[in-house]
Amino acid sequence: DRDSCVDKSKCGKYGYYGQCDECCKKAGDRAGICEYYKCKCNP
């Protein structure tokens, strides 16, 4: 939901960029790794 996409905490799980959900992808990536986004990574 929209609120999860503005959550500024670190991702609940670390993983590859391809494993992040769509709103994470829209927020960008860090060296191809889902490390810090404005929403959580997929499990």
From Swiss-Prot:
Annotated disulfide bonds: C5-C23, C11-C34, C20-C39, C24-C41
Q: Which GO terms label this protein's molecular function in UniProt?
A: potassium channel inhibitor activity; toxin activity
What cellular component terms from Gene Ontology apply here? extracellular region
Entry comment describing in which tissues the protein is expressed? Expressed by the venom gland.
| Keywords tagged on the record | Disulfide bond, Ion channel impairing toxin, Knottin, Neurotoxin, Potassium channel impairing toxin, Secreted, Toxin, Voltage-gated potassium channel impairing toxin
Recorded hits in Gene3D superfamilies, A to Z, give: Knottin, scorpion toxin-like (3.30.30.10)
**Where does the UniProt annotation locate this protein?**
Secreted
SUPFAM superfamilies annotated for this entry?
Scorpion toxin-like
Which is one Pfam family of this protein? Toxin_17
**Which InterPro entries does this chain map to?**
Ergtoxin (IPR012622), Scorpion_toxin-like_sf (IPR036574)
Q: Which PROSITE patterns match?
A: ERGTX
Q: What is known of its domains?
A: The presence of a 'disulfide through disulfide knot' structurally defines this protein as a knottin. Has the CSalpha/beta fold, which comprises one or two short alpha helices connected to anti-parallel beta-sheets stabilized by three or four disulfide bonds.
Q: Which family does it belong to?
A: Belongs to the ergtoxin family. Gamma-KTx 4 subfamily.
Entry function: Reversibly blocks Kv11/ERG potassium channels.
The name of this protein is Potassium channel toxin gamma-KTx 4.3
Origin organism is Centruroides exilicauda (Bark scorpion)
